[in-house]
Amino acid sequence: MDETVLWQLSYGMYAIGAKHGAEDKGCIVNTIVQITAENPIIAVSMNKDNYTYEVIRESGQFAVSILGEEVDNNVIAELGFSSGRTKEKFKLFAAGHTKEGLPIVEQGAVGYLTCEVLQMVDAETHAVILARVVDAQKGDAKTPMTYAYYHEVKGGRTPKNASVFSSDELEADAKAKSEAPAAAGSGGAKKMRVGWKCPICGYIEYADELPPDY
């Protein structure tokens, strides 16, 4: 089977926020689908190893921040590449809360959904969470970020718990980026690009010197 065909499916980038007592918990997912229009129901794919999955299973509710193309890379780095078992990730960037007290990404999101769990369907490594959308509000961003934009423009990589994770894809992408030369200069000589890669989220900043706030 040619599993690369599955890469042609379209995905987004979403921050999930949940509450564990007084603590804010969350993660990044890329697979959310609207199932019904009237009294809207959505389906969320989430790895069962995620601590956020445990929190949602216990609390029965969560918020979705639909991330925009402008969102700070630190948001994805913290929510997507670290565990909420030992820290409150929403304290590490500009975050807000829904009227129900659920954590959301306050800056760089197209909109927010407040959801109540209806059912959790087992899907081997993952669970499909069917949830009722009980509230929806617009955010400050204009264009929702696609999974392709995250990889191709922001230079991001895939968390190992994502539903579309592929180690082969990541290795090929990293090799291509490291070997990619800049446009030919005078005399036809190729000049190598200098890039600084974040070890957490995989974002690559192309610059001769590392920015002071990187």
Where does each model-flagged region fall?
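Short cysteine-rich clusters marking metal-coordination/redox-active sites
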Residues: 198-201, 214
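Basic, polyanion-binding surface patches
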Residues: 1-193, 205
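Short linker/helix segments within small regulatory modules
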Residues: 207-214
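Processing junctions and N-termini across compartments
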Residues: 192-195, 210
